[in-house]
Structures are given as C-alpha cells and as structure tokens.
Amino acid sequence: MAEKTYPMTLEEKEKLEKELEELKLVRRPEVVERIKIARSYGDLSENSEYEAAKDEQAFVEGQISSLETKIRYAEIVNSDAVAQDEVAIGKTVTIQEIGEDEEEVYIIVGSAGADAFAGKVSNESPIGQDLIGKKTGDTATIETPVGSYDVKILKVEKTA
C-alpha cells in the first residue's frame, strides 16, 4: 500500500525538521532524566512521578514518530508551478462572503503548517479543499460541518 504524502511548502518542512530536532535533542533527554529521577524514588507501583514521566515519554515518542513520517513523505509544493491567480498551497487568498462587506485573508498551507490563529488554513480543511484550484474572480461554496456559504475570490498572490 502506498504511503500517504504530505503536501507542504519547503518552509513548512524546515519548520517540522526543527521541531523534530528539538524533540530529539532536548525533550527526549529531559524525559529520560525525569524517568531516571522518578525511578530513584523506589517502588514503581505507587510512583506517580514515574507514571507521569512514562506518559510524557510516550507522548514525545509519538510526536517524533509522526514528524518523521510527515518529513519522510513530504511532497514539496512549488506555488510557482500553478497559475499566478490560482489558489494552491503556498498562496495567500483574499475572499469575501457573498452579501457581506468584510474580506478574509487566508494562507493555504499543507496540514503540517495549519495555524488558524495566524490565518493559515490547511489544504485538507473544508475551506482549503473548496478553494484549491479556484482562480481570482471565481466563486466557491464552502462546506462546513455547520452549513455552507458562498464566497468570491478577490485576490490570489504568492505568499511572501
């Protein structure tokens, strides 16, 4: 079975690599040290510090594994390879809900780079899926779990 690929920009991949390095070189050794200290307290059957450290170790190792998979199967997307006015990963898109005055600006990223607070939406999110491939002037219906709404794409530009 073919592995899933993770479309992302080069910047997103570099961010994941830094995060992985931090986990391996800083967090993992910290957790190992906490386990070592907790073991020194004696009886492990009633040692809450030991259990907490082991839980944290499992969490950190899970994060490491997830990041390694995303990096290994990263598919670097070159936004220059698509039309200048076409919505794609690595592009900034300005939209306006039909019948509303307010404009919204989103940066389309791979799932690894999503950050709603920074206006970065994943290509796998409802809004990302519904905008990918559309061009300036197009309308799109955004399907969300709570309903749908129509938007007009006002501007598409390469993300700086």
From Swiss-Prot:
Entry's Gene3D superfamilies? Transcription elongation factor, GreA/GreB, C-terminal domain (3.10.50.30), Transcription elongation factor, GreA/GreB, N-terminal domain (1.10.287.180)
Instruction: Fetch the PROSITE patterns from UniProt.
Output: GREAB_1 (PS00829)
> Which keywords does UniProt give here?
Coiled coil, DNA-binding, Transcription, Transcription regulation
Q: Name one GO biological process term.
A: DNA-templated transcription elongation
Give this protein's Gene Ontology molecular function annotations: DNA binding; RNA polymerase binding
Q: What superkingdom does the record give?
A: Bacteria
Respond yes or no to whether keyword rRNA-binding is given for this record: no
Any single Pfam family the record assigns to this protein: GreA_GreB_N
Q: Can you tell me which residues the record assigns to a coiled coil?
A: 1-72
Family designation: Belongs to the GreA/GreB family.
**PANTHER family (UniProt xref):** TRANSCRIPTION ELONGATION FACTOR GREA (PTHR30437:SF4)
Mind telling me what this protein is named? Transcription elongation factor GreA
Origin species, per record, is Streptococcus pneumoniae (strain Hungary19A-6)
